[in-house]
Regions:
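Intrinsic disorder/low-complexity segments
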Residues: 7-8, 93
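Bacterial N-terminal signal peptides
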Residues: 9-16
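Bacterial N-terminal signal peptides that target proteins for export
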Residues: 1-7
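Low-complexity repeat regions of mature extracellularly deployed or surface/particle-associated proteins
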Residues: 23-153
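Sec/Tat signal peptide C-region and signal peptidase I cleavage site
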Residues: 18-22
Length: 153
């Protein structure tokens, strides 16, 4: 075997092994999951809890942002509760005991806190917050009460 043939075989061998190494990198088995630079990191601290005991209760909780806490607890029947949060560092809590109660909390902004507690029947309460650093709490004990709180800053 002459030198040129041996050099050509060595070059062919090196080129073919380089292709295998590049192909192996395409599998990405050695990378951690979600390490793709094209993905956004998951939102920080979104927590939602809905706990229902009874019949015909309706609850809706929608969150968009970071560091959000939403909690709905219903005991009884025919109750409605809605929480909509958009922003950062928001907390909304709704607790309902009885029948036919309706409650809603809407929060836009940051660092807001809202709480509705209903004990009784056919009560209606709503809290709407838009801005920063707002706090509101509503407690209804009895029947047929209605309240609406709107805070803007």
């Amino acid at each position: 075997m002459n030198k040129s043939t041996a050099a050509l075989l060595c070059l062919l061998l090196l080129c073919s092994s380089t292709g295998v190494r590049a192909d192996d990198l395409m599998e990405n088995d050695d990378l951690a999951p979600s390490a793709d630079l094209g993905e956004l990191p998951p939102p920080v601290g979104q927590q939602a809890l809905i706990d229902q005991n009874g019949q015909a209760n309706l609850a809706l909780l929608s969150q968009n942002g970071q560091s959000l806490l939403g909690r709905i607890v219903q005991s009884g029947s025919n109750q409605e509760a809605y929480i909509l949060q958009q922003g950062s560092d928001l907390m909304a809590l709704i607790t309902q005991n009885g029948s036919g109660n309706a409650a809603s909390i809407t929060q836009n902004g940051s660092h807001n806190r809202a709480q509705i507690s209903q004990n009784g029947n056919n009560n209606d309460a709503s809290i709407e917050q838009a801005g920063t650093g707002l706090q509101s709490a509503v407690t209804q004990s009895g029947n047929g009460m209605s309240v609406s709180v709107k805070q803007y800053r």
